[in-house]
């Protein structure tokens, strides 16, 4: 009696979906949870609770030290690319001058041969000698020519004869960009933001009993005293840096035209919406699926240690 098909499901000429999952081959998708989502009070670069937070006009929050190091690294990379681009332009100019010199020398040589030669280049005597000297496709001259052609042939399927592609360096952008949103960003466009910490009695007893760290801090809206969480939409004032919940900012700021904490004048353009933190729920977050393409064979052994989800 033949065995069931489920016991012989690995002898097909192609990979099935189950075999791809077990081997980790192809496009792998993973559902991200709450632990993989950045909270609202974390730096977008170091992913740790921010220290001296700075914000751009798109709402991305960074540590002051992290964003300064990022700008410094971008400046160094721009200088390196500019140097490489200028070196390439100089090399192209030298090659163009050399090509023009060779072309001019070739034209002068042809002009000299046409005007000062005693006999034409292709005479009947030379033509007859060349004709008599040819002994067919098996001659030594033809064989050596074919061997030389094979050696210099641009066969892309041979590693030794693969033509090298010229690497061109494009002119780089001279401005720094936001590491999170990739838009143009300068240091003067950043502004410091100030969160209001929760100084209630429970928080005070908690900080006295345990070592105080930035992980234990919780922040509140200075207007409604509601604890700020990842589910709330936050608004920062670029004029003074204070952070409010979106409800208070839309309710009081357009009417009073001043900050509710320091009474500093503010306008509608000073309201900057901060990027919300992640909760891990599909209704709140947009991108909760990680995707990666892997080139793995059956002999890698990773299929044995990779967890298979059902």
From Swiss-Prot:
Q: Which cysteines are joined by disulfide bonds?
A: none
* Pfam families with a match to the protein in the record: Rtf2, zf-NOSIP
What InterPro entries does UniProt report for this protein, alphabetically?
Answer: NOSIP, Znf-NOSIP, Znf_RING, Znf_RING/FYVE/PHD, Znf_RING_CS
**What reaction does this catalyse?**
S-ubiquitinyl-[E2 ubiquitin-conjugating enzyme]-L-cysteine + [acceptor protein]-L-lysine = [E2 ubiquitin-conjugating enzyme]-L-cysteine + N(6)-ubiquitinyl-[acceptor protein]-L-lysine
Task: From the UniProt record, list the coiled-coil ranges.
Answer: 75-95
Glycosyltransferase: is it a keyword of this entry?
A: no
Cite a GO CC annotation: nuclear speck
Q: Which SMART domains match?
A: RING (SM00184)
Determine if Zinc-finger is one of this entry's keywords. Answer: yes
Compositionally biased residues, Basic and acidic residues? 122-133
* Key words, A-Z: Coiled coil, Metal-binding, Nucleus, Repeat, Transferase, Ubl conjugation pathway, Zinc, Zinc-finger
Q: What is its EC number?
A: 2.3.2.27
Record Gene3D superfamilies: Zinc/RING finger domain, C3HC4 (zinc finger) (3.30.40.10)
Biological process (GO) annotations held by this record are:
photomorphogenesis; protein destabilization; protein ubiquitination
- State a single Gene Ontology molecular function: zinc ion binding
Q: Which PANTHER family match?
A: ENOS INTERACTING PROTEIN (PTHR13063), NITRIC OXIDE SYNTHASE-INTERACTING PROTEIN (PTHR13063:SF10)
Please report which protein family the annotation says this sequence is part of: Belongs to the NOSIP family.
**Function of the molecule:** RING-finger E3 ubiquitin-protein ligase that plays an major role in maintaining COP1 homeostasis in darkness. Negatively regulates COP1 protein accumulation by targeting COP1 for ubiquitination and subsequent proteasomal degradation in dark-grown seedlings. Negatively regulates the accumulation of SPA1 protein in the dark.
Protein name according to UniProt: E3 ubiquitin-protein ligase CSU1
Q: Which organism is it from?
A: Arabidopsis thaliana
